[in-house]
Amino acid sequence: MDVDEPNPIVISDSEATDEEISIIYEPEFNENYLWAEENVQEASRSQKIVTERLSLDSTAGESCTPSVVTDTQVTTGLRWSLRKRKAIQKMPYSLERIKHRQLLEGYDISSFDSISNQLTLPKNASTVIHSNDILLTKRTGKPLDEQKDVTIDSIKPENSSVQSQRYDSDEEIPKKRHRTFKDLDQDIVFQSGDSTEDEQDLASTNLQNTQNDEVIFRGRVLNVRTGYRGVLPRVAWEKSLQKQQSSKVTKRKTQLLNHKGVAKRKMNRSAHIEDEEQNLLNDLIAPDDELDIEENAPPDIYLGNLPEDREANEKELKELQEYYESKYSEDAQSAGTSGFNLNEEYRNEPVYELEYDGPGSCISHVSYKDQPIIYLNSRHSDSGFSEQYNISAEDNQSVISLDAAEEHNDGIIDKMLVKPKRIKATNDANFLNTKSKRVRRYKYKYRNSCLAPSTKAIKVGKRSAHKSHLAANNPVSFVSKKNHVIDDYFFEELESQSLEQDDSSSLKPQKKRRKKKAPIYSSFSADLESRRKPVFNTVVEVPTNRYAFTKPNVRNRDSINHDMEFEEEDSNQELGPIMVVLDSILLKKPFEPPNFFKIQLSDKSFLLSKLNPADIATSLQKIFRVIIDKGITDTELVHFNESLIAFLVHLDMPELFDLIGEFHREFRSKVNSLRKKAKPIHFFQIAACQLMFLEISRYNKISAAAKFDMDVKLLDHIVSFFKLLSVCYDSVMKNPMQYLYTSYYILSAVVDVIHKKEALWDLFQKHPFSPHISLLLVNIFPTKVCRWQVLRLDSEFQPLSSAFRFINYCIETCNWNVTNSLILSLDRIFKRRRFSDFEEESDLSQNNKIIYPPTNQLTSRLMFNRYLHLLTLCELSSSDTQRVIPMGDISMNDSLSVLKNRLNLLIVLATRFDLNLEKRFQELTRPLYSKEYLNLHTQNTVRTITTLIMQASLSFLEISRIKNHPFSGKFIASLFDKLVLQQPSISGVTENFLKEFTNLVSKMKRKSVSMLKFLYPSLVAMSQENIFESSFFLLLQVYLKSLDVLGPTWVQNYLFQFIKSKAQENERWIECYCQIGKFLVDSGIFTWWTFFTYNGLDAALHFQLAFHSLIIDFCDTDSFELLKKPLYSIASDLLLISKDDAFYHFLSNLLKRAHIIVADLKPVSDENELLRLAYIFSKALKKNAYQDLLAVFLSLAKKHYDEGDISRNFLAKYLEFLNKNCLTELRNNQLFISLRRELGISSDEDEKCAFWDSFNEAGDILSKAAFVETGIVQACCTGNEIDGYLDNLSTLFTSTMLESPFAFFSDLVIAHIFENRPFFDVNIKNFLLSHFIDLFNKVLKMKFEQVSPDEFAELCKVYRALCIECATDDTFNSNSDLIAAKDAFLVSVLRIADGFWEHDKLLQLRMLDSNMNIPNQIPHTTLQSSLSAIVIKIIESNIGKIEASEPFKTFKNT
């Protein structure tokens, strides 16, 4: 520690306010510990805090520590002391032992002598008190021996003695410390057992009557008899104790300004030198782990409270106890489950962590507000790196070195006393869950959670079992910088792994950007935004004369910033001066460079001083020569560079540029000669030279032109840096990378300072680099301008794979566009390889597919597929597109990958650009059809080739469909002719191809006629092979769906004749034949009659019936009427004998087309089913008035009866059916008459025939109505004839004698509802009307209420008339028979209307009554009026007979 350096600053132990400080112990003030201070402002601030507090308490308490001085004079200003004895003079043996220990631990002890000479010691030594037990009592003005009477009963610990240790031994002794709370009103007794050695040491003293006391001094438990070891000579120690015992200590308030225990901040210290000296100073204080501390030590020993103080602070201590009990009881419970997650942010709060040494320890609870804390302003918060630090699980348990000096201020200690421990970090953020990973070491661990300056509480002692509550879970936030990201992912992961082939990743479209990771290395500009003013100070702590408990600063508690953590002393502090220099250059921040610096290289020492500028160049040249010729350690090199960089600021010696430039050239040349032995530290030196060049170029003596030239040279040097790195890359990557990362950052910052990033990229493009180096460049010097020329493309697999990973990264992360130059460069590589895959990709190559559909993305990660993906992301010009098209033919020796890649390339180009590459596709596949090529390959290979061409053909067909391009399809004809037909074994592949082919052709708006005509010979050839039957009909479907495109002439001349010749063989052919015949009929080539008569089939009956069935389905209505009778004739010939399914299918189609309601017919199993089928067919013949066909069918029945095909019972039942339903058509047929006589069929039906004859002879409608009306009047008068007559009338509804039977009888019924009231009895009208209603009910029941729309309309007319008549005629409702007949009719009509819109209206009519406004008469039509007159006339002429008849009388009386 250099005490002669200027600008020390005094900082108190605690930055607490006055009211937060309670004086516990105040030893004698010794100004030998004060250092000279020049920074008055910082000193005044610290002095003010202490002075104000001391003004409240003017009396000093009695000391409980070994060194007590009472005669202290305190002043308010700076006080200087005379020269005192140095530590080397007072403690030569101790310092020699410390020096030896440091040497064994590997520390640089070159400055040990200067440090030890500058240390000062207290002038007064204490004397050892010979006592076994010392009672700590209330403070009084009496001596210690007079205070016994005022003590309170002691509380002894559980273990009455603790074995003392030999502190002069080099062996570490584990400490034991146990604390517990006792009653605050009791005295505290600290006892320990005496060892044999201690008794011998105390034998020569005069204090045998006192107890063996142990006290707490600066957080350490000291034995008053052995506490001098390592601190003072024994004589001085005993003398101090004697003086303490005899002195009067008065309690007074004093003003304390500069005193012991005040930390002093040394300004502008070199971080590297400070770190070395700090490690030496750590051992000047005996570590706590060499002490034996009695278990269950009273807490007042630590707190230093005497009875007077406890009486005054009883309330405060009670609050203290309650707070810690509530706070740490919860922490203890959660300690087992709380983890240490490095992905979380540190909460910026002080650390209060109690030590825990084992289950037997007893931890005392201390108040939060009284917790002694030493706050330090972090001197490393200005670093340029912002890097998330990782700590291994092992280091997490022992962050603080066990060799470090520790103060047991309840777990808090100044960080300067802690020896930095080497910290390891892993690649993975979740490293705690892994057992072994690659170790990464970072120099600076920067956590910038807030921008405001803050202090940091430093934790002391070993890691407690209780996890720190500052272990955070939130990710570190950074201030981002535009266009400049130096990402740890890309420096760590990408350099080692990301450029290796990864099957799980693939290139993504440019539109889908990957979410960027939060950078671990923040940019230089971002640091400039977030850093505070750089202040580099060393904080040193010396023994204090006052102890205070500090309340937490609640206001700033949440904003305490944990800026940095440290790792190794040789690498932690490299960037401190570097970043300060960059700040001074870029931000014009004030920076006071050192006036000189001294460096020790090997056995030589060099001093560079501004007071002797003439020797600077010479000394530098000598230093450079030592570095070049002999070499130095990494630590020395880093220390030299940071010292020189800081020294060069404002030196204003431009001549050093050439000197450093010569060193830079030689050093770089030597590194180039090393190559495989190059290390990151070498590149750190080269980068440091660039920063030196930058400093020199900013000198005042440098002209603008010279500055410009220097900047140009600086850019050249940076390019040379990466050129050299590319040469030594493999060897450098085998070493820890922290120095290399540092060099990256320096170069990035330098380029930002000179604002020549784009000029640098112009130089980079002139010297292409490997993908690894290129990846570094885009991360160190990010740019959105596409700089693909920086990438060197090689045709080897691994470099090319890395190149594609680099390209992918630039596209997704850097937003670079794919340019024509990049595509053409890659195209040249693949063309040299004839578009074949690499041997390393053999497995992927075998599984590679042809792109189909063409819009699909390739999933295979083959190199060529990555290239194809890039093609989809660029906009090639027409000329460049032509250059990319593969023009060469496939040779005999080319692998299948050549065919796949070329086909895929054509498909991508045809899809992405407006090109029709069908011709090029045909040229590409032509050599594959040669016999020489096919004979050279195995059957499986030929099968694969055929499949590839088929898939490519489908893709080109789809592209033509999407873009509506003309498509000749010659290559498809060649495919079938040369490959498909020559390989019957691939019929399954062909079938799958034709399924897709048929689907695509059907979707095409512009169907290719030429393609179909080219394929026609292949179609005919495929029909000759049974193995291609399924494929043939799939291909034939293409023609059948394209008949209109092919035209009727070509279809008739080629396709129709070809299909007709094949139609005799298969029903599928017949269906195709009929489809083509329908097309030709629709085109007017011939008619259905011509097609049925002259183009029929001469094949078997089964095929003929199939042909007839299709004719029935395809022909139009008019053609069917012409063909219906011949088709019925065919059916009548086969009905009684055929058992073929084709016949029943034909008969079903025929009857359905003739509107005969019938289910699908199946072959009959017995005569009853055949008889029902004969009934249906006979009705169809009757309906179509085919009496001749009905007579023929009867004769066929007689013939089959005679032959025994049908039974007598069958014939008899069939004749009964004909006698009942077809008597009119067959009554003059002699065969019918004879068979009826032979089989004994009744002739009652003849009466019906006579009725029909009379009815037909009546003439017009009015005459027929008069005939019916007369007949019903006569039948009513007769009595028993009415039912028979109604049966005869019902036959009129099923015969053809009336055009519309329902209309005829509905008018006749309405005619009985007279417009004017007749002169005869109305009951006669109602009597006749009831019989007509019974007729309708009989007919509806016979027809199962199944009527046509016209018939339903007629029924609705009758329904309306009856409802109105019922509502208006009182006599209508007086007869129950009439009402029953009427209601039955209305219900039947409503049932028929159910579900139709008429139903509601009919229901409303039924609800009419006499109270409604209803017309008394129903208006009649002309026909109805005429019929009404005829009815009245007939009734009037037969009124006497009607009234005398029994049926009428009965009706009238009901």
Curated annotation (Swiss-Prot):
InterPro entries for the chain: Mms22, Mms22_budding_yeast
Cited function: Substrate targeting component of a cullin-RING-based E3 ubiquitin-protein ligase complex RTT101(MMS1-MMS22). RTT101(MMS1-MMS22) promotes fork progression through damaged DNA or natural pause sites by stabilizing replication proteins like the replication fork-pausing complex (FPC) and leading-strand polymerase at stalled replication forks. RTT101(MMS1-MMS22) ubiquitinates the acetylated histones H3K56ac-H4 at lysine residues H3K121, H3K122 and H3K125.
Pfam families (alphabetical): Mus7
Example GO biological process: DNA damage response
Protein name: E3 ubiquitin-protein ligase substrate receptor MMS22
Family: Belongs to the MMS22 family.
Subcellular localization: Nucleus
Quaternary state and interactors: Component of a cullin-RING ligase (CRL) composed of 4 subunits: the RING protein HRT1, the cullin RTT101, a linker protein MMS1, and the substrate receptor MMS22. This complex further interacts with RTT107 and CTF4 to form RTT101-MMS1-MMS22-RTT107 and RTT101-MMS1-MMS22-CTF4 complexes respectively. Interacts (via C-ter) with MMS1 (via N-ter). Interacts with RTT107.
Record key words, sorted: Cell cycle, Cell division, DNA damage, DNA repair, Nucleus
Gene (name only): MMS22
Residue ranges of the region described as Required for interaction with MMS1: 1201-1454
Chief site of localization: nucleus
